[in-house]
Every structure is written in C-alpha cells, then in structure tokens.
Design a protein with these regions (language model features):
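Basic, polyanion-binding surface patches
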Residues: 1-213
Length: 213
C-alpha cells in the first residue's frame, strides 16, 4: 500500500504510521512547577539525541483546548526535569499517570508511587524505577501542525546525572533482561523489551580494481 499522511488516504481504520516506528522508548517524566507541586507523566516520543554532552528530547502535543501540557511548561519554567525509565512491573502505575489530572494533582499519589530525591535537580525520582536521568532544560523547538489550535513541540535537555539500579548491571553492562523497559507500539499496544542479541560487523575485504599482473 501507499499513502500520503497529509491526505490520510490509507483506507485503514487507524493511521498505521506510529505502528511502524516501534518500539518507541518511553520517558516517564517527573517535573515540579513554580509552586513546588510535582507532576509525573509518560511520553512515547522520546530519545537520546546526542552523546557528548548527552542530550535527550521528548515531544509533547498540546491539550484539546490548545494549552501546553504540565511536563512541557514545568520543564521550560523551572529548567529541570527527570526521565524515569519504567520497567515492565510498573506499566500499570505508568498508565495511571497518563490520565489527565488537573494541574497540581499528584500522579505519584494516584499511582501509589514513592519518590526519591534527585541529586542535581529538584524534581523527585520514581523510587522503584530501574534508572533515572536528571536533566536540565536546553530549549524548545515548535514543530509543524496541521491544526492551528494544536501545538506540537520538541523539548530538549542535557543529562546532568544518571542513576542505575545495581541489580540490572551484569558483567559491567546494563542487562536488557533485567532492565525490561516498557516501549510503545502502535494503536494502544505496548511491549516490554527483555530479549536482545549481539551482532558483530563483518569487515568486507578490500576491492581489487584491475590487475597487478
């Protein structure tokens, strides 16, 4: 099949595009507003985009009324956020925090989650998450939108501190079998990544052009 996203002429019940770019890692983002109130929400448009210094991005769409979401606003206004990596055991709690609570309402409390203090930033961490990235806000890039009332934004941050549960480190490396991160698939589907493999790049022999004869 072939279709053009602007025309939405795929002929399927649901747009298949997000079911192709998978699995997408999920940033479980904790922030704090200017009044000291904590927010927690998952974002599946997320990735590490640079290594030195390490930079991450998450993308946020506006609410139905056009207002920017709390995680986005808090990161911009306070300059800080924490990315918690959710494991398979935490998916129900993570889904609870995806609900649309009013500003200032505690998603931590609703999901029954304990907090841990961060070291270099103010937003707390999810206590039982296997890894956390403390981040400082870098900038926001507004992205195109086909709906003038709908805002798409990419928020960039620099990772300033990393926490890893020692239990997921095996032989000096993070074990994907122990990390078991939650990933987003298409539609309403999710995956828990727990199986990986190593593959060496095989060097190709140099090409011989002509003859030395």
């Amino acid at each position: 099949m072939y279709y053009e996203p602007d025309k939405a002429d795929h002929g399927l019940p649901h747009d298949p595009l997000k079911a192709l770019v998978v699995p997408r890692p999920i940033a479980w983002i904790s922030t704090i507003d200017q009044r000291g109130r904590v927010n927690l929400a998952p974002y599946s448009f997320f990735n590490l985009v640079a290594g030195d210094p390490p930079c991450v991005m998450f993308a946020s769409s506006s609410r139905v009324d056009g207002a920017r979401k709390d995680s986005h606003l808090n990161a911009e206004r306070t300059g800080e956020f924490v990315i918690n990596i959710a494991s398979g055991e935490q998916i129900d709690a993570m889904m609870t925090t995806s609900l649309d609570f009013p500003p200032g309402h505690s998603e931590f409390r609703e999901a029954g989650l304990a907090t841990l203090p961060s070291v270099l930033v103010r937003p707390p961490r999810v206590a039982r998450a296997p890894a956390h990235l403390e981040c400082r806000y870098l900038k926001t890039v507004d992205l195109p939108s086909n709906d003038p009332k709908h805002i798409n934004s990419m928020i960039l941050g620099t990772v300033v501190a990393v926490h890893i549960d020692d239990a997921i480190i095996v032989d000096g490396r993070v074990s994907i079998e122990r990390l078991r991160p939650v990933g987003r698939l298409g539609y309403r589907d999710y995956a828990v990544v727990h199986d990986g493999f190593a593959k060496e790049v095989v060097a190709r022999p140099p090409l011989r052009i002509g003859s030395l004869g």
